[in-house]
From Swiss-Prot:
Pfam families: DUF441. Its main location: membrane. It is a multi-pass membrane protein. Belongs to the UPF0756 family. This is UPF0756 membrane protein lp_1894. It comes from Lactiplantibacillus plantarum (strain ATCC BAA-793 / NCIMB 8826 / WCFS1). The lineage of its organism: Bacteria, Bacillati, Bacillota, Bacilli, Lactobacillales. It comes from the Bacteria. PANTHER family: UPF0756 MEMBRANE PROTEIN YEAL. One of its GO terms (cellular component) is plasma membrane.
Length: 152
């Protein structure tokens, strides 16, 4: 019963915060919970859902390469600027931080509750996005702003 109340509270917060992604995600989880004998499905989604989400985001990121909007020339150009090098460094940093984050969650699963709450607060109150690879771009943006670098 507690999980239903918690999910409904999240749905209300998502609705009040006008966060469509969180609303959809919460409704999907509630609908899955309504179906009998779905505990294995919920467990599988809980264990593999992040990887599936990262895969979907990665596909979306690769689309400009597939359509020809981005090519080797753009990659070469990126390496000729401080902004490009910062982006590469942030990508490496995020992957290392993610590695350590997974280790932390494995060692202390109770932190998951705080992370979920913090993510929901960031998504709803600060109009953030609950995503992984996009964090690298966000960190890159912050460093670029601090160093007053041009995006060109």
């Amino acid at each position: 019963m507690e999980s239903w109340l918690f999910l409904l509270a999240i749905l209300v917060v998502a609705w009040l915060g006008k966060n469509q992604s969180l609303q959809i995600a919460t409704v999907v989880v509630l609908l899955i919970k309504l179906i009998p004998n779905t505990s294995k499905l919920l467990t599988t989604i809980g264990q593999k859902g992040i990887n599936w989400g990262v895969t979907v985001i990665t596909v979306a990121i690769l689309i400009p390469i597939a359509t020809g909007q981005i090519g080797f020339r753009d990659l070469w150009h990126a390496f000729k600027s401080p902004v490009g090098w910062i982006a590469v460094a942030c990508g490496v940093l995020v992957s290392v931080l993610s590695f350590h984050g997974v280790g932390l969650l494995s060692a202390t699963p109770e932190i998951t509750v705080a992370l979920v709450f913090g993510t929901i607060m960031g998504v709803v109150l600060l109009k953030g996005i609950a995503a992984g690879p996009i964090i690298a771009a966000g960190i890159t943006y912050c460093i670029i702003q601090v160093l007053h670098l041009s995006l060109q």
